Curated annotation (Swiss-Prot):
Originating organism: Candida albicans (strain SC5314 / ATCC MYA-2876)
Listed GO biological process terms: autophagy of mitochondrion; glycophagy; nucleophagy; pexophagy; protein localization to phagophore assembly site; protein transport
Listed Pfam families: PROPPIN
Membrane topology: Peripheral membrane protein
Segments of skewed composition (Basic and acidic residues): 366-375
Protein's cellular compartments: Cytoplasm; Membrane; Vacuole membrane
Protein name as it appears in the record: Autophagy-related protein 21
Function field: Required for cytoplasm to vacuole transport (Cvt) vesicles formation and mitophagy. Involved in binding of phosphatidylethanolamine to ATG8 and in recruitment of ATG8 and ATG5 to the pre-autophagosomal structure. Protects ATG8 from ARG4-mediated cleavage.
Keyword Protein transport: yes
Biased composition range(s): Polar residues: 49-62
Superkingdom to which the source organism belongs: Eukaryota
Length: 529
């Protein structure tokens, strides 16, 4: 039985690769079609021809006496593509206890191996763009390479929490040349060195030594950005230096944006109160999407530079649902107008995220707007609905008064201006003092500032994959986009789906959104195996 090890879109979603226990294949997404395979074919030149036997790599399971109709097996753990170029990263899958420690860089067009790297432990993830190659090991090391010359620049020492038997890397690398790496602060430890920008003389083939990491004692105060969600953080009261350990103790939901070009932190902000489960960065404009382990709220942080410093310009909150669920996929559309979210519920949600003109902030009032961004508290599952009802009643007690009956034609106008009036009312000092004493003050503030935004479209896959503790990726999907199409690749079946995105009729209102959500239409279905 063929096992899917990895599914991966290239950064512009034009191609998708599948790595299996038999080999790998690369497909064009639209129009769909296979254009490369590791298995021998008389119609296609294969990279298999240039794979030579090496230590740590399983030998091909065929001989010269084999029939030409019998495909060769080259088990592959990972395959990553650099946009639509011929440069490809391949990690062969091994059957021994040493793990997948060998990485090879190929030029597929010329069927030529450029170089290979051996690592001290097994590779669990790979990130790359035109400037940088990141290799993540199961022992917590993150290797940062200059891709242009495959030169090792830095090794970050991290800590990974094994969740549901799946040891994975939580983080993302921007596709543009800024090369920002976003990781949870909880993934750092006392040996994580984010402040030392010296590259030193690093060997092309890494060897793990105690000097690869430096004890972290530096101050990160200048990189902290406090949003409305973190306005009550104890870190604001500290006058002395703030270490990564201080940030970790404050909350589990802080994330750090790290510049892999200049090897220095960019900004650190609190995304959630709970542990971060998923991070995704947009293809442009520096938008960061995060999900916590609760999986009820997705947050999008718009990062912009003001006076030489990167700040959180705006926060958008997206309500995935009320039930606790594991979010396993987040993907931005190429134009940044849509965010796709997949979870173990087997439903994919599509959120409209582009800003209306009234939402755009100028440099003059950006700081004020940042302090007043809404930030919904993570849902607590079964009690979320009752909390909403309670806080809605509290809102009515504070901001409502008996009104005379109004004609039907004026009702819509009053409804549309309700949130504008309440935003002004919340600035009242007396009202603010009352809110601080409420048992559900966090949720109440969010209710006043901005109603929760739900998805405008969704996808129910024709397959059902129940959660399997032995295989955490059994119900995981990868999401890609191309204009008005959304691509879904399933780990469970190896199927590749193309769906039509419903046309958006104006801005998605936060009121009665359940009536406006539409199901995407299935256009075509293929198999990647």
């Amino acid at each position: 039985m063929v096992t899917i090890n990895d599914l991966s879109f290239n950064p512009d979603y034009s191609s998708i690769s599948v790595s299996t226990s038999d080999g790998f294949k690369i497909f064009n997404c639209e129009p769909f079609g296979e254009f490369y395979s590791s298995q021998e074919s008389p119609l296609r030149k294969s990279i298999s021809n240039s794979l030579e036997d090496s230590a740590g790599c399983q030998n091909p399971t065929h001989s010269k006496t084999d029939s030409q109709d019998t495909p060769a097996r080259f088990p592959t753990a990972f395959l990553k593509m650099l946009f639509s170029t011929s440069l490809t990263i391949v990690v062969p899958q091994t059957q021994d206890n040493l793990g997948n420690r060998l990485l090879k860089i190929y030029n597929l067009k010329q069927n030529l191996k450029i170089c290979e790297l051996n690592f001290p432990s097994s590779i669990i993830d790979i990130k790359l763009n035109r400037k940088r190659l990141l290799v993540v090991l199961d022992t917590g090391q993150l290797y940062i390479y200059d891709l242009s010359c495959v030169r090792l620049l830095k090794i970050l020492q991290l800590s990974f929490n094994e969740h549901d038997g799946d040891q994975k890397f939580i983080g993302d690398l921007s596709a543009d040349d800024s090369s920002w790496l976003i990781i949870p602060v909880q993934s750092t430890n006392n040996q994580t060195d984010l402040l030392n920008a010296e590259t030193g003389s690093q060997p092309s083939t890494p060897k793990l030594t105690p000097s690869d990491s430096v004890i972290n004692t530096g101050s990160y105060s200048q990189y902290l950005e406090f949003t409305r969600n973190s306005s009550l953080s104890n870190l604001k009261k500290k006058n002395k230096l703030i270490t990564l350990e201080d940030i970790k103790n404050d909350s589990e939901g802080w994330v750090v944006v790290y510049d892999t070009i200049n090897l220095a932190p960019v900004v650190i902000f609190e995304a959630h109160h709970s542990t971060i489960a998923r991070i995704c960065i947009s293809h442009r404009d520096n938008k960061v999407a995060t999900a916590s382990i609760k999986g009820t709220i997705i947050r999008i942080f718009d990062l912009k530079e003001f006076e030489g410093k990167v700040k959180v310009h705006k926060v958008k909150n997206l309500r995935r649902g009320h039930n606790l669920v594991k979010v396993n996929s987040l993907s931005f559309h190429n134009d940044n107008h849509i965010l796709g979210c997949g979870s173990e519920s087997n439903t994919i949600h599509l959120f409209k995220i582009h800003e209306e003109e009234s939402d755009i902030c100028t440099n003059e009032n950006s700081e004020d707007r940042t302090n007043h961004n809404s930030d919904y508290e993570d849902s607590d599952g079964d009690t979320s609905k009752s909390s909403e009802d309670l806080n809605e009643n509290l809102a009515n007690l504070l901001i409502s008064k008996p009104l005379d009956p109004v004609p039907m034609e004026t009702e819509d106008k009053l409804s549309s201006s309700w949130f504008v009036k309440t935003k002004k009312l919340i600035n009242n000092q007396y009202t603010s003092s009352i809110i601080k004493k409420l048992p559900y003050k966090d949720y109440f503030e969010n209710l006043i500032w901005e109603p929760p935004q739900r998805s405008f479209a969704y996808i129910k896959l024709p397959e059902y994959a129940p959660h399997n503790e032995k295989d955490p990726r059994s119900n995981k999907v990868e999401i890609g986009f191309n204009n008005d199409l959304v691509f879904i690749a399933s780990y469970h079946t190896g199927n590749f789906y193309q769906y039509q995105i419903p046309k958006q009729r104006g801005p998605v209102s936060s009121i009665n959104e359940d009536d406006k959500r539409e199901e995407c239409s299935l256009i075509s279905q293929f198999n990647l195996i």
